[in-house]
Swiss-Prot record:
GO cellular component, one term: cytosol
Binding of Zn(2+), residues: 141, 143, 212
Pathway where it operates: Carbohydrate degradation; L-rhamnose degradation; glycerone phosphate from L-rhamnose: step 3/3
Highest taxon, organism lineage: Bacteria
HAMAP family hit by this protein: RhaD (MF_00770)
Requisite cofactors: Zn(2+)
Database matches in NCBIfam families: PRK03634.1, rhamnu_1P_ald
Gene: rhaD
Protein name: Rhamnulose-1-phosphate aldolase
Hydrolase listed as a keyword: no
Self-association state and partner proteins as the record states: Homotetramer.
Similarity annotation: Belongs to the aldolase class II family. RhaD subfamily.
Amino acid sequence: MQAILSSWFVQGMIKATSDMWLKGWDERNGGNVSLRLTAEDVTPYESDFYPQPRHEALSQPMPALADCWFIVTGSGKFFRNVQLDPADSLVVLQVDSDGKGYRIFWGLTNGGLPTSELASHFQSHIVRMGVTHGHDRVIMHCHATNLIALSYVLELDTAKFTRELWEGSTECLVVFPDGVGIVPWMVPGTDAIGDATSEQMQRHSLVLWPFHGIFGTGPTLDDAFGLIDTAEKSAEVMVKVRSMGGKKQTISTEELIALGKRFGVTPMEVALRV
């Protein structure tokens, strides 16, 4: 048996959370990450599991996730400290066979619970499992500075917000041709915001929480991080463009269409018509 601290998924979570903090996206205990695992991923580390796993109830049944394994950031844990004490900052859990609760097999050594946004993560995992036929395994939430800033000055319309980001950096249309979904401002940590987010995840791999942050998804931690990083870089460009007096020229609709054809992606049609 191997030590779970050296596992690819613990090490991956350490790197992702450290990188997110260094980017300035996750102040204090802001942000949360979850990675769906397989039984094969966790089996080699069973010797590190708690002999009597603690059981917790879910806020609503999630039968679609029955028996699924996850590694998740802990509630109230600072991302800057994950690298210092991953065993307290992270948690490996398995959803019950009836989907009504979960058991904590490793982590949270000083007590506590998984992220307060667990409902949002799980609801989005269910949707992305269906949309991508199980390919997407990561849900990542952070407080990306410039995306938040743009939510104060741009109309909160999916097509218009997406178009702005596509124009902010040539690679954006290639990286997220499905655009950015937007939910209304809502109280975080509730089933309601989880419902709204997962509904947008049916069509978008990025979902903006105005005045709060961004949700991203992908097959790997690198994919989800890179997705958010790309959108945030474009948002930073557009914040700077506004500070310099606004656009004098930009990428045209025809050029965006040509870009999609060159890279074999289908851009969200409504964003092309803005």
